[in-house]
Swiss-Prot record:
UniProt-listed GO biological process terms: Mo-molybdopterin cofactor biosynthetic process
Catalysed reaction, written as an equation: (8S)-3',8-cyclo-7,8-dihydroguanosine 5'-triphosphate = cyclic pyranopterin phosphate + diphosphate
Classification via Pfam families: MoaC
Biological role stated in the UniProt entry: Catalyzes the conversion of (8S)-3',8-cyclo-7,8-dihydroguanosine 5'-triphosphate to cyclic pyranopterin monophosphate (cPMP).
Record-given protein name: Cyclic pyranopterin monophosphate synthase
UniProt xrefs under InterPro entries: MoaC, MoaC_bact/euk, MoaC_sf, MoCo_biosynth_MoaA/MoaC, Mopterin_CF_biosynth-C_dom
EC class (word): lyase
Domain of life the protein comes from: Bacteria
UniProt gene name: moaC
GO molecular function: cyclic pyranopterin monophosphate synthase activity
NCBIfam families: moaC (TIGR00581), PRK09364.1 (NF006870)
Length: 159
């Protein structure tokens, strides 16, 4: 069985002690996809949804969520994020929106969860704002694509 840093020697859950780690610049990038009907995508892009500008609202929600990750995920450390960015890439040929979230910090622990949370909440916000028009939307394949900084170095997800 792999060693899990969130478990102590007795198997109890703990928050990882990062006090001996060096402060380094860290970055994480996550992506996800939201599939929908072509009419729904067109309405989002035309800013014709009844609840307003869907993508800008989702961008703000994703940024806010990244800043609150430590309040949502029990063993995450509170971080002084230096940058959070959420971008949207509409794909008309697949009737979907690719969501990319990026988080940066100069700190002792990584920002993977913050990037993943930004993408997740941005996707949920789009779903919430458009569900009256398209209940069949699907949030898909939210995953980490890149991270660097810290002891483990760089990770690039080729898949």
């Amino acid at each position: 069985m792999a060693d899990f840093s969130h478990l102590d020697e007795k198997g109890r859950v703990q928050m990882v002690d990062v006090s001996d780690k060096k402060t380094t610049d860290r970055l994480a990038i996550a992506v996800g996809k939201l599939s929908m009907k072509p009419d729904t995508l067109a309405s989002i892009l035309d800013q014709a949804m009844p609840k307003g500008n869907v993508l800008e609202t989702a961008r703000i929600a994703g940024i806010m969520a990244a800043k609150k990750t430590w309040e949502l995920i029990p063993m995450c450390h509170p971080l002084e994020l230096t940058h959070v960015q959420v971008d949207f890439f509409p794909e008309t040929e697949t009737s979907s929106i690719r969501i990319e979230g990026q988080a940066r910090v100069a700190g002792r622990t990584g920002v993977e969860m913050e990037a993943l949370t930004a993408v997740s909440v941005a996707a949920l916000t789009i779903y919430d704002m458009c569900k009256s028009a398209d209940k069949a939307m699907a949030i898909e394949k939210i995953h980490l694509v890149r991270k660097y900084g810290g002891k483990s170095g760089e990770f690039v997800n080729e898949g």
